[in-house]
């Protein structure tokens, strides 16, 4: 077998084309207008329109509304309850998502329970939740209740 040498390497047949010489007469195939047609902006040197140009009409990228903000990829959702919703519960009762669903205070859950401080804590409650606001914790403990943060 003959050894392969660099000077013997040639491109495959049909893979290389000669550069098309435009504007060099009729017989060359691309004479006179060089394949650009007759007159107009597109036939001129440097002619053409910018990307997105629609002939003077308001282009699509300007007709569409601008995006407002962005959407989170993995948004976190919580089940929210305010202290004013807990005013009808009996004193010293255990409060968590299950008991709130049973009592009819919540109709559905959408994540961990968060207790917010809107309203007053009238009775002592033992509340178990994932998060308490500072005002909610203060009002619950002032009424004699306890706040337990679940992991």
Curated annotation (Swiss-Prot):
This is Large ribosomal subunit protein uL15. GO terms for molecular function: rRNA binding; structural constituent of ribosome. GO terms for cellular component: cytosolic large ribosomal subunit. Binds to the 23S rRNA. InterPro entries: Ribosomal_uL15, Ribosomal_uL15/eL18, Ribosomal_uL15/eL18_sf, Ribosomal_uL15_bac-type, Ribosomal_uL15_CS. It comes from the Bacteria. Keywords: Ribonucleoprotein, Ribosomal protein, RNA-binding, rRNA-binding. Residues 1-51 are annotated as: Disordered. The lineage of its organism: Bacteria, Bacillati, Cyanobacteriota, Cyanophyceae, Gloeobacterales. The gene is rplO. Residues 15-24 have a biased composition (Basic residues). It comes from Gloeobacter violaceus (strain ATCC 29082 / PCC 7421).
